[in-house]
Amino acid sequence: MLSFFFLGVCEGWGDPHYITFDGLYYSYQGNCTYILMEEVTAKYHLKIYVDNVFCDPTEDVSCPRSLTIAYGFQVITLINHNLIGAPKLEALQNGERLKLPYSQQSIKVMSSGINLIYEIPRLNVVITFGMTGFAVNLPYKYFGNNTQGHCGTCTNNQADDCRLPTGELVGNCAVMADYWPANDIYQPNCPTPPVVPTNVPEPPLEPTPCTPDSSCDLLKSSVFAECHPLVSPENFYKGCVFDSCHLSNPIVECTSLQAYAAACAQAGICIHWRNHTKVCASDCPPDKVYKPCGPAEQATCEDNPNEQITTFVTEGCFCPDGMKLFNKESGICVEKCGCLDPEGIPREFNERFEYKCQDCICDEPTKTVICKPKTCPAPPTANCTAPGFIVVNQTSSVDPCCFVYVCKCQINTCPVNSMNCPVGYKPVVSVPEGKCCPEHTCEPKRVCVHKDVEYQAQFQSSCK
């Protein structure tokens, strides 16, 4: 008898490989948007679409580019904009990017840096999406015997997983998958399957000899040995071998390992596997650390102890041990809770600091930064008695937030001197160092003067 609390997991990864809710493995290379899961009888109004696109330049193999989740009146798309290298993940609603974490109308959307996590807390539904592909976790309590699509029927019976929209069963889920296009989405380039399905036996994974990459062997090695009794690695190994032999991008092989590690994590076994590979390294920002099993909803300074948080674990980039997020929006890790200043720098409670010529404090009662204009000491009065100097205030060289009084030369306030020099002399204007106003002096010219008349002096001659 199936447990009332049984959790069905449908997984898809690589190019892509599927494991249905009931554990049936198959591969499918469709290049359209399909119904991944829908309710046979609408009870909770949950429907999930998967958009598969060709993702290799040398082979017609496809990868899951996005999941679109329709729940009630909300439609949210989890998308990976980069299928070749490091994932570039976004959550969209009505074409607009969601600021994560998002929590509204009974759903949550979070990011671990490596995966996006979509949760419906009241139904215990958790959906993850990332470079690895996706995993849809549904409780049998709400969805048992009431699902159809690429993920199968959630009946704990693999024999009825390959069901067509008509209810007819076929023996090959890769054939079945053709019949689940998202008809309510305009897709002019999607092929129309034949009216009567043909049960073509699945071809062997590799018709010609192929040596898979050594990364695939890790799945059956001691690295994952602790998980083997709980989750079989066989389907993930088959997917890894197929990807290794068909795709030119070696990073895709990582998806099988990542998908298996995620399945192990949900079974309670955390595997540190990435450091055993050459091409599956994690990439976290400098202020975060990689963890193979961390909380999908990370602890913050703003957590309400009475509020239920997600217990789902995922790999990703997390705050170092002993630190937590300041809040859900900032993404900043702190050792002690306090305030964020206007520049986003964490401040401890009662810490005083200066910001843009304001004296600020991280106020503990309000948990906010309170600022007031900085109080400057009264500057000494400048004694400007010399001609031309006036008193002005200017920014202090010691403290740019305060001002001082200085004597500044204002030449247009200087007295006007009309100086007449005697015959044979010329007026010379200069401003002595330390003074403002020009001073006039009379200097002799190189001329001869006779009866108040100037004469040009001749070389080696004398004036008589």
Residue ranges and their predicted role:
Residues M1-K464:
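Extracellular/secreted glycoprotein ectodomains characterized by long, lumenal stretches
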